[in-house]
From Swiss-Prot:
CDD domains in alphabetical order: KDSR-like_SDR_c
Keywords for the protein's UniProt record, in alphabetical order: Endoplasmic reticulum, Lipid metabolism, Membrane, NADP, Nucleotide-binding, Oxidoreductase, Sphingolipid metabolism, Transmembrane, Transmembrane helix
Positions bound to NADPH: G53, S55, G57, R78, K82, D108, L109
MF terms in GO: 3-dehydrosphinganine reductase activity; NADPH binding
Protein name listed in UniProt: 3-ketodihydrosphingosine reductase ksrA
Keyword set includes Lyase: no
Enzyme superclass (EC): oxidoreductase
Binding positions (NADP(+)): Y211, K215, I259
């Protein structure tokens, strides 16, 4: 302890220490962004990738960028016409359309049996091999005050946000983790299961009561799976193993903020005015920007991936027991965010109080 104290001036004030900490956080964050990474932990060329919710918005942008990098892409959504149109756009971005393969599947992912059908169909289409990557992008947001929202909407949001992801993950992992005997085991690259969450899972905002809990549930599921998956990875690593899964698996979660899309336009029409005021700092990104930042995070090997600096600060404020991307960067940024959110959280509550003081009890007329 004496060595640590020797680095701290005896007359340093709390303000000085706080400013120094903030500067350190910004320096570490900037350096990490400047120098990036050397190893690509997410090579996709020649690999088969399933993107749910791939007919528009972020999912479509993700599929296009993966195709541009040489992946074989399967998109999943409900509406056949939108899937057909999206698939043509995805083919148009392909690195080599003659070598790559593309497919779409219409399915209702709130039904677990449909998710199992999707994985089975992709496996058959992929010459009997399970997909290498499954990226869960399905879901939409219906904002509103909790008491003003019908209970069936609360349930619907859990179905379309959480259960589409959980059902897809369950079907995928059942396929990936089925043990095979040593005689059938061949070297396979690491597989990736990717969830798409929201920064609202870190810091929720009034008006997102139907949506935020479902996203928080995804984050919790991903954290749990990041531990459970190591049981299967460990079984593969055993020197005297018997039956084991055919490949290691890694879990990732993406945390975008606002995304400019048809779904966002619909969301804005439902959103309480208070919510719009509280999230004024959230500058929506284009789907292509979110997809690019997400893929860059995957290529770095990150577990929790945010797509802009504000989201990074929100993540740092709520790391909890989640695995860190970088012990040093995440720790310093969490110290910085703890100072920032000493101001932010009371400010959000104060604005909500003042909004009620001015507008009265929320109702459908206040939207």
């Amino acid at each position: 302890m004496s060595q640590i104290h020797s680095f701290i001036p005896s007359n340093a004030s709390p303000a000085t220490l706080g400013i120094s900490l903030i500067l350190c956080g910004f320096i570490v964050y900037s350096v990490s962004k400047m120098f990036g990474y050397r190893t690509n932990h997410f090579p996709v060329e020649g690999r088969t990738i399933v993107v749910t919710g791939g007919s528009d918005g972020m999912g479509k942008a993700v599929a296009c960028q993966l195709a541009e990098k040489g992946a074989n892409v399967v998109i999943v959504a409900r509406t056949v016409q939108k899937l057909r149109e999206a698939l043509e756009a995805i083919k148009g971005t392909a690195q080599d359309v003659k070598k790559q393969r593309f497919h779409y599947i219409s399915a209702d992912l709130t039904d677990a049996a449909e998710c199992e059908r999707v994985i089975a169909e992709v496996t058959e289409w992929n010459h009997g091999l399970a997909p290498d990557v499954v990226w869960c992008c399905a879901g939409y947001c219906e904002p509103g005050f909790f008491v003003e929202t019908p209970v069936n909407t609360l349930r619907s949001q859990m179905d379309t946000v959480y259960w589409t992801a959980a059902n897809t993950a369950h079907a995928t992992l059942k396929s990936w983790l089925a043990p095979i005997p040593p005689s059938q085991q061949v070297p396979l690259p690491q597989r990736h299961l990717i969830f798409t969450c929201s920064t609202l899972a870190f810091v929720s905002i009034a008006g997102y009561a139907p949506y935020s809990p479902a996203k928080a549930a995804i984050r919790s599921l991903a954290d749990t799976l990041s531990q459970e998956i190591e049981v299967y990875n460990g079984a593969r690593a055993a020197s005297s193993r018997n039956a084991a899964p055919p490949a290691d698996v890694k879990i990732h979660t993406i945390f975008p903020m606002g995304i400019l899309s048809p779904g966002f336009d619909n969301e804005q029409g439902l959103k309480p005015q208070l919510t719009k005021e509280l999230e004024a700092a959230d500058k929506p990104q284009r789907p292509i920007e979110v997809a690019k930042a997400s893929i860059q995070g995957l290529e770095k090997g990150d577990y929790l991936i945010t797509t802009m600096f504000v989201g990074h600060m929100m993540k740092a404020s709520a790391l909890g027991a989640s695995p860190r991307n970088s012990i040093i960067t995440d720790t310093l940024t969490s110290w910085l965010s703890s100072l920032v959110f000493l101001q932010v959280i009371p400010d959000l509550r104060k604005k909500a109080f003042n909004w009620g003081l001015k507008n009265g009890v929320p109702s459908s007329q206040s939207k």
